[in-house]
């Protein structure tokens, strides 16, 4: 039996395993992944030509291994192949390669008792091999199971249908380069749709790009740089976080002093000034693209105009290939439709809800996102571990969470009144559709059969991925090993309800998955304070407020925590 099995060999899985082994070097740790190479989103199977990371060089790495800059583009963009190579280097340096089993897709995870005592049993698809572990760390995150909408007529459709996740598969790359594939329909408006359209145009195809009229609209794409600085860096500043209302307070307080003064006690004038600052930033991001200069451009305008950056009705992205806008505005090889696909016909026709038909579609690429649920848990187990589920809570638990939801929504809008200005109030939701994870890592309550035996890393979508994943991995390690004190279940549940209520009010796109775009540094601060670590890593207050936070700023944080634990043991605390 393994001490720990980590499901997923991407960014989260590698750092979670490395951190656990650093704390428990004699532990038997196994990492399993269904792909043929490590990397998760950045595995070889998911890389395709011209794909580059949104994060700027120096921000897309872990604190204990700088990325080799030889393959980085002159403007700081990181090719996808360089990201994959970095993760292989990381796994090699920390002796993880020999602990990884690839081509092992886990189809079932369950908690059971037996001769081995209470443990987790993982069943691999195909072989039905069973793996057993005392503890599991789930790192498959929020982009693991592809979502393809129901497309009536798909079985008879003579063209091909695939998810954007498959664009890097060798057979897909070969098909796209095939001259017989001339016309492609791309469905979706997220960053992955922009990347897919760029790939197809570079391959010489013509594209009909279909984006639903409803929903959050197309992603707001920021330029590579703003005022001479890479736009992605703005997210790594505490200054930006100060302008975002969030509930991640200091110990013993629900809001920090700044949040209390600026976002809680302030009047309408302060809220107006805050929103004005965000609108100015929004304008600087939108201005380079000239949305109104063409019919195609107008159809890509963010849903909320100058309020799109603050409220984020759709996920934000960095326009890693700005030359795509020339193709968009010319309209010669790409045409954008604000419509929905209602069906497919045998003769390669794609039907839209407006009644229009797109003919000769050799390929349909669905850039339509991901399932929020993790199917390797049974429906009732999904709810037990804190994940959204298709099953329902028992009536008592359901009423408890509904009451907590209502109370939390009232409290969060009273404490952060600017959130009452949300232009699209959150719709009623099943409480079973929420993630019920304390700190987005641990289940809401521990039962005798689940006590500190499972943790999650990568279940909060942010712009500071490596920094967040390292903090979550250390928190998860401390939690699983019993070195971290956590509140009793009722308090954990109240805090979970608060953060869920905040996300629904703060980020419109956070109503599908947990989201903290501009607030990840305060979230990381909270995790490190839980662990007894000072999260302020800069040399002075000016640098702390205005400086750029990089992963390197947190170098040595695991060793620091281990030293603190050893000191506690020596002192008998």
UniProtKB/Swiss-Prot annotation:
FAD-dependent monooxygenase; part of the gene cluster that mediates the biosynthesis of the tetrahydropyranyl antifungal agent restricticin that acts as an inhibitor of CYP51 and blocks the ergosterol biosynthesis. The highly reducing polyketide synthase resH, the short chain dehydrogenase resG, the cyclase resF, the FAD-dependent monooxygenase resA and the enoylreductase resD are required to generate the first stable intermediate desmethylrestrictinol. InterPro entries: FAD/NAD-bd_sf, FMO-like. Belongs to the FAD-binding monooxygenase family. Its EC number is 1.-.-.-. Its cofactor is FAD. Keywords: FAD, Flavoprotein, Glycoprotein, Monooxygenase, Oxidoreductase, Signal. Glycans are attached at residue 235. FAD binds at residue 106. It comes from the Eukaryota. It is an enzyme of class 1 (oxidoreductase). It comes from Aspergillus sclerotiorum. This is FAD-dependent monooxygenase resA. Pathway: Antifungal biosynthesis. SUPFAM superfamilies: FAD/NAD(P)-binding domain. Residues 1-17 form the signal peptide. GO terms for molecular function: monooxygenase activity.
